[in-house]
Each structure stands twice: as structure tokens, then as C-alpha cells.
């Protein structure tokens, strides 16, 4: 085929040798946000397909995730208790950015929560990582308090198609067991908006 270059000249191109470019993160994010929660036979299978839509792999070896990112696993932060392994649905490790780790022993994988909220939260950690180069950019800090999980929930609801009611149920349950870091509010919503627009610094 013949194409015209920026210089106005005509060039002949062999179309049979063309390549398909990997979608941008914006394209992948929109693909996930628009996707149904019923992509496979059952909730766990649907959640896995949702992760794959983002060009990421779902691994059931959550211990490997903890080995790859020990600093992000099981660390209490002030009044916010860290989740134990038996409480952990999934895990995103920045050292292995193309993998979401799932804890298959959690019953939530068999519920609508898995595709509608759980994996969309984990994919939002990846989204923030892609946009800011870290899962904890300055934008998530509120008066010296790390709001990573709350901002990630807000991002999941605003940009990844997460079900707000199911996210809120998980927030309420987590808070009842001492894990208050997942709550959403006006700050986390604003921070998610800023991060989505590429503003990763403190606002």
C-alpha cells in the first residue's frame, strides 16, 4: 500500500509485514471498566478473565507475591492493622507488575465480589503504578497519613468499573476488624481523580 509521509512524499509499505502494537494502559483500563462481571463460568473464572483483559496474569501463588514484596505484606501502620494472609483476597506487588496474586482459599473468589470489586481494586493498584511509577505517589498522603488503599478503592469505583456498594461492604467489614485504611471519602476521590489525570504529586 502507499502512504504519505509528514514530508508530503509517497512511500510504498508492505502491509503483510505490519505489527500489532500493544494497547496503551488507557485502552486497557477502559476495556476493564466496560467489561461485564460474567466473563467466565463462575465468579473466579470471570475475575481471571477480567485480569487478562488488562494484559495481566492472575497467579494463585499468593505466597510468591509476599516473597516478591515483603515490605508491602503484613505491615501495621499506626491504627491501621495490616491484613493477615487468611484475610487477604488478593495482592499487587510492584516488583511483578504484570501479575495479580490471588488467595484462592478466600471464599470471596466464589462470590460476585471477585469480578465486580476485588480484582478491580487490585488492578487499580496496577493503574496507579502505571500512571505514577509507584503505588504510593505523594498524592495519596493526607496530612502525613498514607491513604493508599482508600485512594485505590476510589480509583476502582471511578475508573475501573468497580461496584461501589460491594466496595463499601468490604470497607465496612475491614473496618470492623481493625483495618480502617480502606475507607473512601472526598480526599480519596480527589486523589484518584488527580492520579488518573497524571498528577501524582501532593495536591
Give, region by region, the residue ranges found by the protein language model.
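A metal-dependent hydrolase signature that marks the N-terminal structural subdomain at the beginning
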Residues: 1-82, 199
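Active-site scaffold of zinc-dependent metalloenzymes
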Residues: 69-114, 129-130
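Short alpha-helical catalytic segment bearing the HExxH-like zincin motif
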Residues: 114-126
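Second-shell loop/turn segments in exported
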Residues: 34-37, 105-109, 138-144
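Long, well-structured alpha-helical subdomains associated
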Residues: 145, 160-203
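Solvent-exposed, acidic/flexible segments
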Residues: 25-28, 32, 81, 108-117, ...
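Surface-exposed patches in mature extracellular/periplasmic domains of secreted proteins
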Residues: 44-53, 58-61, 135-137, 163-175
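Catalytic Zn2+-binding segment of zinc metalloproteases
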Residues: 123-140, 147, 151, 158-162
Amino acid at each position: 500500500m502507499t502512504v504519505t509521509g509528514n514530508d508530503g512524499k509517497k512511500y510504498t509499505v508492505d502491509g503483510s509485514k505490519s505489527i500489532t502494537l500493544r494497547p496503551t494502559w488507557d485502552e486497557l483500563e477502559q476495556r476493564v471498566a466496560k467489561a461485564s462481571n460474567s466473563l467466565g463460568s463462575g465468579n473466579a473464572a470471570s475475575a481471571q478473565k477480567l485480569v487478562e483483559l488488562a494484559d495481566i496474569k492472575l497467579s494463585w501463588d499468593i505466597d510468591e507475591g509476599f516473597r516478591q514484596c515483603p515490605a508491602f505484606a503484613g505491615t501495621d501502620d499506626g491504627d491501621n492493622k495490616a491484613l493477615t494472609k487468611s484475610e487477604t483476597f488478593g495482592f499487587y506487588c510492584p516488583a511483578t507488575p504484570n501479575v495479580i496474586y490471588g488467595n484462592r482459599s478466600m471464599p470471596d473468589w466464589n462470590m460476585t465480589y471477585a469480578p465486580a470489586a476485588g480484582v478491580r481494586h487490585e488492578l487499580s493498584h496496577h493503574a496507579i503504578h502505571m500512571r505514577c511509577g509507584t503505588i504510593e505517589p505523594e498524592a495519596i498522603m493526607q496530612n502525613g497519613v498514607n491513604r493508599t488503599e482508600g485512594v485505590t478503592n476510589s480509583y476502582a469505583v471511578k475508573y475501573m468499573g468497580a461496584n461501589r456498594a460491594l466496595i463499601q461492604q468490604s470497607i465496612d467489614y475491614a473496618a470492623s476488624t481493625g483495618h480502617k485504611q480502606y475507607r473512601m471519602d472526598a480526599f480519596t476521590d480527589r486523589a484518584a481523580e488527580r492520579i488518573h489525570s497524571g498528577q501524582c504529586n501532593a495536591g
